[in-house]
């Protein structure tokens, strides 16, 4: 989010470009599955910039500078990051910041997660923290950025304003991000084919740009009347709220100052910075019965009913959320006008959004029925039995046809020409695979060095399947690294929103904690399983039952979950979803994980197909 003065995003002209001949720091970012832009490290950004100078439409092999990013490639022409072993594609972007800001100085702010690992804040939040640190503010309130956290510089800690839990904070010096001067060709900032006359108008960019504008307005307003810094709040009493972070079901927009006083009591929980985005909200002060949780200066808060009755003529009543989730405006944008008007000192009455309905009414055992056309009500997966590993060369040769006279094109894995030796020559040696050999994949026809495909396969799950890095076509049966667990499914006599005359398929996933196997990130180390059993819902119609059958197949292939780092809590070595989205909100769609959602069934079928799970693949 841009900030007044130094440290914010560089100003742009009408076409969305930085002004010419102005120095700025370049930060490359990728969009995670929760629509948060996460920055690459400075080292990776320098590497991307170097490749960009040579070929603005080329590809960047991230593993050349970071061993943890070996599977990843960035295609500069389409502005997407591609993961070779899973086929996952994510948008990337190139952002510009003032050279005097945190990335320009190589300053990184991080918070400590439950596993003791350090997680970097999003770049906009990092810049805000650094600005406050440089101005010698004793503390910083992140409410205006959508997070109910207080940063205390004296103790270098972050405190949750509801649970009072503290986490350690650190400021680390790293390599400064790359500096650039001059105008930027459009192909470096947007995918080829983007509109040439206007900046991007997708919902995500609208949300980001509006949030930046709102933050500027809030800060400008509060600079005129900065409140005194309060004392540190008392430590939480013994036996207080647990430290686990709860997902915030709804958020309240606020015009509170960035330096506003800490709340006197607990409010609703919100995720830590860097967690999945929800509607930006700020926690309120001590909540009392019948009061709306609006943490902003002004008239005394009243109940929503009396507030509506007392709204004077001409004062807009703005919902905190787009409650129905309909229309061209993203739900998170529905209250943005309220923030801007409130920051400008105009009268605004905000109404509270309802809480999501996560679960159906209680159902007796006699009302639970099997799903028609789907045998059984349960599937279990056990610990993966270690089989003799398939020889990587044999797997690659099974799906490849040798090419005697390859074209003078790039191999998109190593970025060397196909007419020359593989970039893995001297790095990887496999008996019988010469570095100059080139092959063509049978179905899709894309060509690569055989040694490059062997390297890609060896870096993946090594399950006997191969995935084309270009078109994501899967050869063989792809399997995952899901831990052992149980999947149950049955009918319940309740309807989902949007399916009034249809019963509901309920899926219950349950995975216990355990020890990681050789296919997991840290073999021999314990992994956690938070939030289980997890309940998910489908309509009991033809397409819903089709999705269920394919989800069962995906479960048996261990593709539904994996072990990694939670984007919600930052916890590492924990069970997380694996690119196949589920609906976990039964009676509403306030979190984006519920109904009505007319495109969900088609979207999840496409996600399953991308994992190699489809009816066509089953018949093949």
From Swiss-Prot:
Query: Pfam families from the xrefs?
Result: DTC, WWE
Regarding how it is modified after translation, the entry says:
Ubiquitinated; undergoes 'Lys-29'-linked polyubiquitination catalyzed by ITCH.
Q: Where is the composition biased (Pro residues)?
A: 227-241, 268-280
User: Which terms are listed as keywords in the entry?
Assistant: Cytoplasm, Metal-binding, Notch signaling pathway, Nucleus, Repeat, SH3-binding, Transferase, Ubl conjugation, Zinc, Zinc-finger
Q: Tell where it localizes.
A: Cytoplasm; Nucleus
Pathway involvement of the protein, from the record: Protein modification; protein ubiquitination
Residue span, WWE domain? 14-94, 95-171
PANTHER family xref list = DELTEX-RELATED
Q: What is the recorded name of this protein?
A: E3 ubiquitin-protein ligase DTX1
Q: Which gene encodes it?
A: DTX1
């Amino acid at each position: 989010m841009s900030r007044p003065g130094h440290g914010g995003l560089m100003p742009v002209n009408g076409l969305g470009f930085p002004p010419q001949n102005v120095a700025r720091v370049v930060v490359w970012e990728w969009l995670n599955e929760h629509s948060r832009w996460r920055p690459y490290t400075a080292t990776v950004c320098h590497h991307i910039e170097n490749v960009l100078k040579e070929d603005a439409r080329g590809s960047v092999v991230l593993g050349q500078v970071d061993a943890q990013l070996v599977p990843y490639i960035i295609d500069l022409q389409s502005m997407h990051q591609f993961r070779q072993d899973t086929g996952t594609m994510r948008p990337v972007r190139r952002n510009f910041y003032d050279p005097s800001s945190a990335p320009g100085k190589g300053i990184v702010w991080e918070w400590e997660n439950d596993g003791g690992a350090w997680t970097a804040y999003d770049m906009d939040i990092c810049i805000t923290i650094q600005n406050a640190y440089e101005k010698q503010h004793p503390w910083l309130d992140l409410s205006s950025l959508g997070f109910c956290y207080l940063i205390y510089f004296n103790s270098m800690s972050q405190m949750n304003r509801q649970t009072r839990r503290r986490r350690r904070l650190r400021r680390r010096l790293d390599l400064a991000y790359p500096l650039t001067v001059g105008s930027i060709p459009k192909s470096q900032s947007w995918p080829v084919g983007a509109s040439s006359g206007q900046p991007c108008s997708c919902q995500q960019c609208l949300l980001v740009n509006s949030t930046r504008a709102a933050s500027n307005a809030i800060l400008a307003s509060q600079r005129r009347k900065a409140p005194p810094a309060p004392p540190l709040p008392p430590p939480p009493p013994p036996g207080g709220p647990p430290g686990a972070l709860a997902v915030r079901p709804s958020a309240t927009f606020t015009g509170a100052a960035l330096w506003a006083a800490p709340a006197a009591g607990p409010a609703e929980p919100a995720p830590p910075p860097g967690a999945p985005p929800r509607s930006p909200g700020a926690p309120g002060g001590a909540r009392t019965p019948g009061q709306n949780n609006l943490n902003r200066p002004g008239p005394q808060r009243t109940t929503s009913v009396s507030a509506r009755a007392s709204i004077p003529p001409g004062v807009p009543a703005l919902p905190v959320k787009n409650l129905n989730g309909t229309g061209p405006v993203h739900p998170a944008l529905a209250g943005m006008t309220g923030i801007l008007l409130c920051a400008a000192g105009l009268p605004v009455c905000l109404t509270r959004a309802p809480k999501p309905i996560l679960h159906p009414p209680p159902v007796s055992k006699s009302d639970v029925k099997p799903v028609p056309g789907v045998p059984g009500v349960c599937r279990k997966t056990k610990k993966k039995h270690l089989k003799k590993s398939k020889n990587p060369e044999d797997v690659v040769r099974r799906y490849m046809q040798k090419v005697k006279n390859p074209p003078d094109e790039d191999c998109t894995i190593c970025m060397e020409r196909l007419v020359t030796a593989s970039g893995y020559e001297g790095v990887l040696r496999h008996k019988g695979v010469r570095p100059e050999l080139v092959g063509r994949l049978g179905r899709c026809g894309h060509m690569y060095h055989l040694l490059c495909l062997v390297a890609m396969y060896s870096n993946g799950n090594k399950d006997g399947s191969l995935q084309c890095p270009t078109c994501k076509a899967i050869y063989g049966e792809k399997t995952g690294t899901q831990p052992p667990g149980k999947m149950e499914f049955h009918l319940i006599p309740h309807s989902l929103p949007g399916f009034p005359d249809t019963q509901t398929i309920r899926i219950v996933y349950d995975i216990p904690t355990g020890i990681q196997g050789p296919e997991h990130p840290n073999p021999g180390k314990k992994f956690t399983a938070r939030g289980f059993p997890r309940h998910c819902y489908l309509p009991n119609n033809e397409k819903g039952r089709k999705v269920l059958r394919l989800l069962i197949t995906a479960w048996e292939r261990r593709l539904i979950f994996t072990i990694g780092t939670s984007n919600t809590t930052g916890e590492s070595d924990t069970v997380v979803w694996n690119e196949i989205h589920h609906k976990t909100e039964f009676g509403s769609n306030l979190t984006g994980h519920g109904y009505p959602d007319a495109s969900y069934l088609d979207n999840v079928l496409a996600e399953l197909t991308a994992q190699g799970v489809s009816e066509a693949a089953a018949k093949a």
